[in-house]
């Protein structure tokens, strides 16, 4: 829901100001959730979704996560104060659509929030995208192949 295309994952690189670690912090751009503002303007910024998301689905996913956390009385981790790119203990955002597909299909939370049909639909969409990508010969592959001939 947050990174629907193959190219969505290219931005998840350390030092890119796109998050790689699933952490939250106060005005910390290395975290996936950034708390910013003061008083009535205090807000949480989810930095994982890119410009290529369906905003309605991204908001639905955030709401589903919030409801899940509240209904299961999950405790909030301590605020992260360092460089989250360097946090080896943090869970990480998937680095490819292929990795995200596995997590999506195995997610009980996604199935509970969206239903089996929606999970299957977006899983199929990812498979179609991956098959098209796997069949394409990129400029890099052509150049690399000619370098070695």
Regions found by a protein language model. Give the residues of each.
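Active-site capping/gating regions of soluble enzymes
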Residues: 1-80, 84-87
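Acidic, glycine-enriched catalytic cores built around paired aspartates
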Residues: 84-149
